[in-house]
Amino acid sequence: MKQLVLASGNAGKLEELRAMLAGLPLRVVAQGELGVEDVPETGLTFVENALIKARHASAVTGLPALADDSGLIVDALDGAPGLYSARYAGSPTNALANNAKLLDAMREVPSDRRSARFYAVIVLLRHPEDPQPLIAEGSWEGVITTQPRGDGGFGYNPVFLDPVYGLTAAEMDTALKNRLSHRAVALATLQHKLHAMSL
């Protein structure tokens, strides 16, 4: 079985990606298991950051690497927190502080203007200098709640409501969330290529 390194130090993201990749004929290994440390995300776009992470993990391990960069885009905040979603309330990353800052920024925003989306870019590099990385993107439309709901998931999940289901991402069971999420959409685009690829 071939190995694929997941270029992330985010435990919640790793768990989600591993579950979504479970059916593939790959041994999925987190970068931390191979001694790879996080690399600074200095890109100006989600794609650039995902490429930076994948190249770093692949260069250190010599393995193909899968990296994701994602964020929450809130229309009433002109796209914030966006690229800086993980560090919205400052460093180090703190989901509770990020959610509190977001809800505070949205305090006066009426219900009909609370639209938002989770957005993800997933990059697969076969080797560090791969001239044709596979890039897929996905989004998940929703609205920002007025208070946190649910205790599942991670990050902004307690404040992101899927209006079709009437549940926040934190209230959904794993199977439903992994079917609807921005990462699931991006991975679905990538999966048929992974099945056919010679890693």
From Swiss-Prot:
**EC number(s) per entry:** 3.6.1.66
Which GO molecular function terms does the record list? dITP diphosphatase activity; ITP diphosphatase activity; metal ion binding; nucleotide binding; ribonucleoside triphosphate phosphatase activity; XTP diphosphatase activity
- CDD domains in the record: HAM1 (cd00515)
Q: How does this polypeptide assemble, per the annotation?
A: Homodimer.
Q: Which family does it belong to?
A: Belongs to the HAM1 NTPase family.
Catalytic reaction equation(s): XTP + H2O = XMP + diphosphate + H(+); dITP + H2O = dIMP + diphosphate + H(+); ITP + H2O = IMP + diphosphate + H(+)
Q: Which cofactor does it need?
A: Mg(2+)
Keyword set, alphabetical order? Hydrolase, Magnesium, Metal-binding, Nucleotide metabolism, Nucleotide-binding
Q: Which NCBIfam families match?
A: RdgB/HAM1 family non-canonical purine NTP pyrophosphatase (TIGR00042)
Q: Name it.
A: dITP/XTP pyrophosphatase
Show the PANTHER family listed in the entry: INOSINE TRIPHOSPHATE PYROPHOSPHATASE (PTHR11067:SF9), INOSINE TRIPHOSPHATE PYROPHOSPHATASE/HAM1 PROTEIN (PTHR11067)
| Enzyme active site | 69
